[in-house]
Every structure is written in C-alpha cells, then in structure tokens.
A protein has these predicted regions:
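Conserved catalytic-core segment of nucleotide-activated headgroup transferases in glycan assembly
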Residues: 51, 56-142, 214, 249, ...
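Structural alpha-helical scaffold elements that stabilize or flank donor/cofactor-binding regions
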Residues: 19, 118, 160-161
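Catalytic binding pocket for nucleotide-activated donors in carbohydrate/polymer assembly enzymes
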Residues: 46-47, 140-145, 174-246
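Donor nucleotide-activated moiety binding/catalytic core segment of transferases
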Residues: 132-177
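Active-site and donor-binding regions of nucleotide-sugar-utilizing enzymes
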Residues: 1-60
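C-terminal alpha-helical cap of glycosyltransferases
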Residues: 250-275
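Helix N-cap/beta->alpha junction signal
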Residues: 29-32, 54-55, 132, 172, ...
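A short, gly/pro- and small-residue-rich
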Residues: 1-8, 87-97, 184-195
Length: 275
C-alpha cells in the first residue's frame, strides 16, 4: 500500500512503479495524479489500484494563521552531499554549499531590506525553512535578525508551521500542495539562474500553479509586499485552481483510506476461504 508523503504529479517512474514495488493500493488526492500515474510507465492503468481518497495528513491541515511568511524551497541534487542513510533524510554537511547560486539567491532574499521593512510594518514574521536533506547547512545562512532560519529535523512540526503561516514562498517543494489545500496564498520563485528540480509531468506551474511565478528577486519581493499590504489572501483565480485540483476538501481522507483498506482486507479473506 502506498501512502505518499507528497503528490505524484511529476515524472517519477524511476522511483514508483507498480510491478517493481508490488503495489496493491495507491492512495491519491487529485485527478491530475490519476492522469499522471495512468501513464504506461507506471503500470497502474486499468488495475483498480489507484484509490481517490485524499491524503490522510491533510485532515490535520486547519488554518491557524499567526501572521508569518514561510520561505521553503526544495533542494537540488548538486548542492547536497551523496546519500549515506535513507533517501530523504538529512545529509552530511557540504563545505561547498556557500559557493552555490542556490545559497546566494536565498541568503540574499532573507536579507532583503524592502521585504523585511514591509513585514515589520504590516506585522508579519518571516521564517526560512530548510529542506530536510539540506538541514545540515542551517548555520551557513546569515539572515537579517528579523528572519528565523529553521532546520526541518528533530521536533520541527510541518503541520504546525504550515497551518500557522499566512503565505508560502517555494520553488517546487511538495509542501505547496499541503499549503494550497488550506487555500492560503503561494508565490513561486523560479529564478532563471536555478534549473528546475523536476521534469514536467502532470503539473504545469503557468496554468495549474496556485500562485504567481516570479523569476527575479525584485519581482518576488514586490509580490510578497503586495500580499502583506493586503492581508495575505489567496486570489480568486488561484482558489479556482485549488478547487479544480483536489477531489476532496472535507477532511475525511483518513476515513476513506481506512474504508478502502478494510474492503481490501475483506476481499483477501474471501479469497482465502475459496482456496
């Protein structure tokens, strides 16, 4: 049974494939996941394995806005050390990290005085959350004292920081889908100097993304300041995209997953009796 930590809307057949994984049930939240996973590379089409239930952890995503801006980009293969433990966990410290364009762009952002002064004046905190794989680099950042840089390991709660944030800035991180589920505004930062993290799959940011796409730091800061000046409300255009993307938004996902598992187990039991 597959309970994903993210949504399968990008090309990921190298990591997920029914025959290799021996998957019997795959729980999904969006018709766009279903469309992507029905590609022949995954071997799910016409198997009945894909179950449109919603994602269980989304049941706990209830908005608890504490007036904070969350900046949380994903990682890049070239700025992390090779994997030595489980994939997805914090990797060893990379002594070359501070020489990367990735570091320069984001360290500059968390020192941008226009952004910080607007946040102060409008009453928003700013938090920069590292991807778990890059959390060993936390002390490399030199933020303005107003900005809190957070390592996403240990007792850090994603649910807490997502529900308490007013707006999210990300590039390609899968937590965008958690945040959008609460219909809170997102802004994408896709600087030309940084290559995309994923190949195109079933999610296209220009037509399906849940917020504006900014390609320069100045554009990003201007957009964030505008949102803060106007109370950080998701725009109707993007609310429509959220409604189109998710099959359910009723916080009953765990119950549907449980029901599907019980149906599967009952069928297994019946099959045993026939033998």
């Amino acid at each position: 049974m597959c309970l994903q930590h993210g949504l399968s809307v990008q090309k990921c057949a190298m990591a997920q494939q029914r025959i290799i994984d021996n998957t019997r049930m795959y729980f999904i939240a969006s018709p766009y996941e279903e469309k992507n996973l029905n590609h022949h590379a995954y071997s799910y089409k016409d198997t009945g394995i894909l179950k449109m239930t919603g994602i269980g952890r989304y049941d706990g995503l209830v908005n608890n806005d504490q007036k904070q801006i969350l900046i949380t980009p994903t990682w890049r293969m070239y700025n992390a050390m090779p994997v030595t433990t489980s994939e997805g966990e914090q990797r060893s410290y990379n002594p070359e990290f501070k020489t990367t364009v990735y570091y320069r762009i984001y360290n500059d952002l968390i020192n941008n005085q226009k952004l910080i002064e607007t946040a102060k004046r409008t009453g928003y905190a700013i938090k920069y959350l590292l991807h778990p794989i890059l959390s060993a680099q936390v002390d490399d950042y030199t933020p303005d004292p107003y900005v809190e840089v957070i390592s996403s390991v240990g007792d850090m709660s994603y649910e807490k920081i997502l529900t308490e944030s007013s707006l999210m800035v990300t590039d390609y991180s899968g937590v965008q889908f958690d945040f959008a589920y609460m219909k809170k505004p997102l802004v994408y930062f896709h600087p030309d100097e940084l290559p995309a993290h994923y190949d195109d799959g079933g999610f296209f940011y220009d037509t399906m993304g849940f917020g504006e796409i900014c390609t320069t730091s100045d554009m990003l800061v201007d957009t964030l300041c505008e949102y803060m000046e106007n109370g950080c409300k998701m725009k109707p255009k993007y609310i429509e995209r959220v409604d189109d993307f998710y099959h359910y938004d009723d916080h009953n996902n765990c119950q549907r997953i449980y029901d599907e598992i019980m149906k599967f187990q009952q069928q297994v039991d019946r099959d045993k009796l026939r033998k």
